[in-house]
Amino acid sequence: IGVIFIGGDSGYIGGYKEFGEKFNVKYAVLPTGGYETRWFAAYEHMNIEDSLNAAADLKCRVMIPVHWGAFHLGVEPPDYTGFRFNSIVKNNENMADIIKLINLGEVFYL
């Protein structure tokens, strides 16, 4: 059936790999937004590269980035994370099945 992993407010940690080895993670909801400047935000939010690494470590089938687009928390514009993930999906067809970017107010059925 699979596990839904919710990262909450967390930066990238090595424990994701261990979790991915022990559990069948189907969905990973990862905090990806409000991540600049790194010296301040790295402990609580992942940047895009960190979240992609966490998704790989967790061996999830679907990654859902959260904490982006609603509030201006970091130096990056609020919609920048969505723009970057859309670019990644556009340039890497295999990522379209893995990254599910959910817009504010949008419904995503598991």
Give residue ranges: language-model regions.
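Cap/insert and terminal regions of metallo-dependent hydrolase folds
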Residues: V3, S10-N103
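A short acidic, often aromatic-flanked loop/helix-cap motif at beta-alpha or helix-coil junctions
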Residues: L104-L110
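Beta-strand-turn-beta hairpins that frame and shape the catalytic cleft
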Residues: I1-I4, L110
